[in-house]
Curated annotation (Swiss-Prot):
PROSITE patterns: SH2 (PS50001)
Organism expressing this protein natively: Xenopus tropicalis
Molecular-function annotations in GO: phosphatase binding
Gene3D superfamilies assigned: SH2 domain (3.30.505.10)
InterPro entries assigned to the protein according to its UniProt record, in alphabetical order: SH2 (IPR000980), SH2_dom_sf (IPR036860)
Signal peptide: none
Protein name (Swiss-Prot/TrEMBL): SH2 domain-containing protein 4A
SMART domains, per the entry: SH2
Localization per record: Cytoplasm
Coiled-coil segments: 96-127
Domain SH2: 347-439
Record bears the keyword Oxidoreductase: no
Bias-annotated ranges (Pro residues): 284-293
């Protein structure tokens, strides 16, 4: 029954009344689908008929074709403008085009002005000859005037011919010679006037051409300047947006890295509590320092004692003090040794300068690193070679653990733990860079020998 309804696209009202609301909606949906299907079939059939008609039409023969010109090497002949010695520069070509356009514009203006003057003169002469005649009378007398003028012209031509014939037949007199000389002088004066007028006209034309050329040239320069300034502004805007985006991404990455590293440090048991627990067992008691007599230095010593974190050197501390500090406090902790304490790590270096560390890293390339005893503080410096150059990071060794200088940094029990950790986890300040290749000692040189003696 449904097929019959869809084929006829009709349902009896009594039968429709017996259907539920849901069945009615389904039936209406099916009928709409059938309408769309029939319409699509009709569209496809019309398209096929149109294609058949289009293909059946005879095509016009096209005789046009393109032939490439070939050079002596049997390749397509190519001419790059500006490379040949006889080619004009681009700026000169542009100037010539502008000058030609300005000349044409000036000639056009001069022609329009000349036509305007001719029209004004003709109107003025008409008014002088016929001051009381109206337009209708002038129109009626036009044919008559043309006939009269034609008759006068024919009569004058006949008179001139007769005079010429008489001049040829009769011998020339003194009066004729004087008349001819006078006519010649008049003709020469007329020619001079015409030449002067032409020169003035040419001068005006050249001045107008130069004026138009300068105006167009100035407009073109202003346009080029505005385009250049707009490009520079767009470029600066793009760079500033990139810089802002880079700063935001770096800040976000630093926050994410810190959260991730903190969680990993907690999971690995390398947080400060674990470091303190094991440090209390391994670290021997520090011998008491001798009491100094009260002096002006007490104030500076008290300030250093009160200050937490990394200890900086004052003017009284030198290389010997650093060596003494290392032997008394760091050597018992096996700082710079492997976890078992059997050998010194290849990345460990003694008291070397920043320049010496950069020279060592430069010979090993990107990804190399070393850890050296600082020559300025009682601590260490991690030097790393990246694509942008060498970076140096201070390591705080004032507490019972080791960490990079700053707040909320992960703390490690030993230097070896710190290095091993950052072989798999990047330093936040470096982005995604890892400690990959340890940079060892120079051949035949051991820069930490004075620390182990």
């Amino acid at each position: 029954m449904l097929k019959q309804i869809l084929a006829d696209m009709y349902i009896d009202p009594e039968l429709l009344a017996e259907l539920s609301e849901e069945q009615k909606q389904i039936l209406f949906f099916k009928m709409r689908q059938e309408q769309i299907r029939r319409w699509q079939e009709w569209e496809a059939k019309c398209d096929q008929n149109e294609d058949k008609k289009r293909n059946s039409r005879p095509r016009k023969a096209c005789n046009k074709s393109v032939h490439w010109r070939f050079g002596t090497d049997q390749e397509v002949w190519v001419w790059v403008m500006g490379e040949h010695s006889s080619d004009k520069p681009y700026d000169q070509i542009c100037d010539e085009i502008i000058a030609e356009q300005a000349r044409r514009e000036a000639e056009k203006e001069a022609e329009q002005l000349r036509k305007k003057q001719e029209v004004e003169l003709s109107q003025l002469s008409t008014l002088r000859l016929h001051p009381h005649n109206n337009a209708d009378l002038l129109k009626k007398n036009t044919d008559t005037k043309q006939m009269v003028n034609e008759n006068v012209r024919i009569a004058n031509q006949q008179i001139i011919n007769d005079e010429n014939q008489s001049i040829i037949e009769k011998p020339r007199t003194v009066e004729d010679i004087l008349s001819a000389a006078t006519s010649k002088n008049k003709y020469e004066v007329k020619q001079k006037k015409e030449n002067i007028l032409k020169e003035k006209e040419n001068d005006r034309l050249q001045e107008r051409t130069q004026e138009i050329y300068m105006n167009w040239k100035e407009a073109q320069e202003v346009k080029q300047k505005l385009e250049k300034e707009d490009k520079e502004w767009q470029e600066s805007l793009r760079k500033s947006k990139l810089a802002d985006e880079r700063r935001r991404s770096v800040a976000k990455q630093a926050r994410d890295d810190y959260k991730r590293l903190s969680m990993q440090g907690i999971n690995r048991g390398k947080v400060a509590d674990t470091a303190k627990t094991f440090g209390a067992v391994k670290r021997p008691p520090i011998p008491p320092k001798p009491k100094l007599p009260p002096s002006a230095n007490n104030s500076s010593i008290n300030r250093m004692d009160r200050r937490q974190g990394i200890r900086r050197l004052n003017s009284a501390i030198n290389r010997e003090n650093i060596i003494k500090w290392f032997k008394e406090e760091q050597l018992p902790l096996k700082a710079g040794w492997d976890k078992s304490g059997s050998y010194v790590e290849p990345w460990f270096h003694g008291i070397i300068s920043r320049q010496e560390s950069e020279q060592l890293l430069g010979s090993h390339g990107h990804g190399s690193f070393l850890l050296r005893v600082s020559e300025k503080i009682q601590g260490y410096v991690l030097s790393y070679c990246s694509e942008e150059g060498c970076a140096h990071f201070l390591i705080d060794a004032s507490a019972t653990s080791y960490s990079f200088l700053g707040v909320d940094q992960l703390q490690h029990t030993t230097l070896a733990d710190l290095v091993e950790y950052h072989k798999t986890e990047p330093i936040p300040s470096l982005g995604r860079e890892l400690l990959r290749f340890p940079c060892g000692q120079k051949k035949g040189v051991c820069d930490y020998s004075d620390l182990l003696e």
